[in-house]
């Protein structure tokens, strides 16, 4: 199987935490991170998105190329610059962000920019919610997912909510639920599950929102909770997997490493959506996939940066 990740690629300027403070440039952006994570673990992977025709956009493309990610679906524009994120870390490695977006190049990818061969050539399509923040890129994302679904692809969605990237939260829920209705795999943090539950179902138990996600057609829902157990939900069963203990220095790409690990493992075991659904009928298959993904996430948080912190298959084999 092969994977295409659609959405934003940006520059993370990571603080050194010293005084006077300085920042180091890293290629990043959640979908781009997932593409690199999966490629480093051996999956045939592409990135699809709009980059600024500037020094940062070309730096990102070069970084993707160097990590064996196919960039033939990338486009460049001079109508906006590549997005920037300044990232500060606290003592536990947790992040705080200051974004220079919008305007940004990634928001300008349109339906006409898609190479439709992409939908026929990739068995998994992955997106995040940062490509839902404005109307045009939301419409493009929905179009891409719809075309992928028509082609029989597995659709993966990581909510990865960044409220400060939304001009208004007025449309957030409707857009999230629209993507969930197209997804086969959904990954949320516990805080994101609480957000969905509070905004959608108010005082109802969290299980109400979990049931709604599964009834929307999602095959596998994953809920992470920092270093706590990872919960998974299927229409017929649920379970938990404990992640490995690790020293956290930077959580920048933790969730993306997790998703990349999960999708790479699915790509190894499944040939198409039908075999994916059959694979997910066995709890042990999901548990083993999550355990592998959790190892990838644990590796990433023990190192700085995004692409640079993502493990190879050999790295994870050494961790065993």
Regions inferred by a protein language model and the residue ranges of each:
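Glycine-rich phosphate/adenosyl-contacting loop at the front of the ribokinase-like
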Residues: 1-70
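Conserved beta-alpha-beta core of the PfkB/ribokinase-like small-molecule kinase fold
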Residues: 130-208, 218, 228-229
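Conserved phosphate-binding/catalytic region of the ribokinase-like
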Residues: 4, 146, 201-320
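Structural alpha-helical scaffold elements that stabilize or flank donor/cofactor-binding regions
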Residues: 117-118, 178-179, 214
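Short beta-strand scaffold segments in enzyme catalytic cores
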Residues: 36, 84-88, 229-233
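Short, conserved phosphate/pyrophosphate- and ester-handling motifs at nucleotide-, phospho-/glycolipid
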Residues: 38, 189, 255
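Conserved N-terminal subdomain of the carbohydrate kinase-like
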Residues: 44-127, 318-320
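Short glycine-enriched, charge-decorated loop/helix-capping segments at active-site entrances
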Residues: 19-25, 199-202, 279-280
